[in-house]
């Protein structure tokens, strides 16, 4: 019984292809080695970008805390402004010639209590246990944000002196205006920082998922496939040799 020449040629064809595939796999491995150096550089850059975005994100968190401080301060000043309005009303009443001394004494008593409540509002306005009416520095995405809020003096307030009350109200208005400007500035900083963080994360992802990394994965997958093909071809060759040996016996 004779072995078909066509079968032999087919087996040799598979074996040759398997050999070529193995050679190609070796070339691919060499290519991976060449690429790995670039990937290491990319990875270092990606790590730097990740660190940068993490720093920016923490700065954004700090900036939100700064806004929280300003919002607490503004809420307190809203209450204080209402108290100042009441003091102004009492001051106008004091100028009523029809009031007797007892009635004026009652107005002064109320005014004293209002002044005490104003002081309490300044002293009890806290964020995370810290009084907001002081100087605070917050490291944010693009630098440092400083909240410089000092409590207003109330010792000179008197319903017998309306000018002292109107001056106090003017100072309140200026302080609230500064708070509003501060919130707007920090919000703008947050928006810019968030965009920078997004850009850093996008750049990091591009480096970690670039074509070169994809090629490395492709090389590994092809190498496995080609070795599998070589194994199948070798197995076929071994089976063929076994059949030949049996026929020659």
UniProtKB/Swiss-Prot annotation:
Transmembrane segments: none annotated. GO terms for cellular component: bacterial-type flagellum; extracellular region. GO terms for molecular function: structural molecule activity. InterPro entries: Flagellin, Flagellin_N. It is found in: Secreted. Disulfide bonds: none annotated. Interacts with FliS. Might play a role in virulence. This is Secreted flagellin C. It comes from Campylobacter jejuni subsp. jejuni serotype O:6 (strain 81116 / NCTC 11828). The lineage of its organism: Bacteria, Pseudomonadati, Campylobacterota, Epsilonproteobacteria, Campylobacterales.
